[in-house]
């Protein structure tokens, strides 16, 4: 995304509090923070002697991070905004958004512009730049389905690079940027390919039930209907992080092979599962946690949400260590009872 040049020195905020920059609302402090509004500022970091030798952390909405300690480095607050149609052909629109653009606002904008496709991903917290890192997904859709490419800056060199889907190596809630590329790049712009022929994604019962409750037959649903249904479902199930600190779903839904699933089903016939195209089986992590009796329980100021067992919350004053201790206790109980490993979605620092 073209950005105006910015040759001014980076403005550093010393001893910057981070509670307002993570959706858990966990108190932590960064040695420095800097607000990044232009790609050129990322590109110049490696030449700035004040920060070049320090650890660097790029933060968007802070919806996928748990701070267990202060950050002894510079936190780069990605505020690169903007959204535009960069081109279109007979089949699709190619839409670009800045890395710091709020994700939900971007999804709503695409609908307002008559370019549907992302509506199942409505109300997911965070920014556009964070979406490819996590390969966000919900209600039968992963971001990678509409991903075209992104521009990222390598922090150590200031070099801008283009990544296509193959280079991003997307997996389930995973990508190159969570593995080999972790901490190395800042995503400054993402381009999505939105087909002009809309294909509704209505494979999840929650969505069709919500449509039915609104008197809308699935085969008559519009993109706006699906968007509104998903927003209503998420608001009913998930706490607002502005009111109750959380990072959305804390654990990935585990994927196991067929043999392991057969053994598990023999022990737990009611296990909630979703067959995958490759023969593996995805399990509902929330069901596993609920069966272990964790829904609504707390360890100190960290707790499992009373309506959604996948969501861990900060009841007020919880530290990252508190959240991590709760997560580990849940992992232990699920492992002992079901022989299944739960993997956290957020990055714990």
Swiss-Prot record:
Pfam families: FAD_binding_4, MurB_C. Its EC number is 1.3.1.98. One of its GO terms (cellular component) is cytosol. The active site is at residues 173, 249, 345. Residues 25-197 form the FAD-binding PCMH-type domain. Gene3D superfamilies: 3.30.465.10, UDP-N-acetylenolpyruvoylglucosamine reductase, C-terminal domain, Uridine Diphospho-n-acetylenolpyruvylglucosamine Reductase, domain 2. It catalyses: UDP-N-acetyl-alpha-D-muramate + NADP(+) = UDP-N-acetyl-3-O-(1-carboxyvinyl)-alpha-D-glucosamine + NADPH + H(+). InterPro entries: FAD-bd_PCMH, FAD-bd_PCMH-like_sf, FAD-bd_PCMH_sub1, FAD-bd_PCMH_sub2, MurB, MurB_C, MurB_C_sf, Oxid_FAD_bind_N. Its cofactor is FAD. Pathway: Cell wall biogenesis; peptidoglycan biosynthesis. GO terms for biological process: cell division; cell wall organization; peptidoglycan biosynthetic process; regulation of cell shape. It is found in: Cytoplasm. Keywords: Cell cycle, Cell division, Cell shape, Cell wall biogenesis/degradation, Cytoplasm, FAD, Flavoprotein, NADP, Oxidoreductase, Peptidoglycan synthesis. One of its GO terms (molecular function) is FAD binding. The keyword rRNA processing does not apply. Belongs to the MurB family. HAMAP family: MurB. This is UDP-N-acetylenolpyruvoylglucosamine reductase.
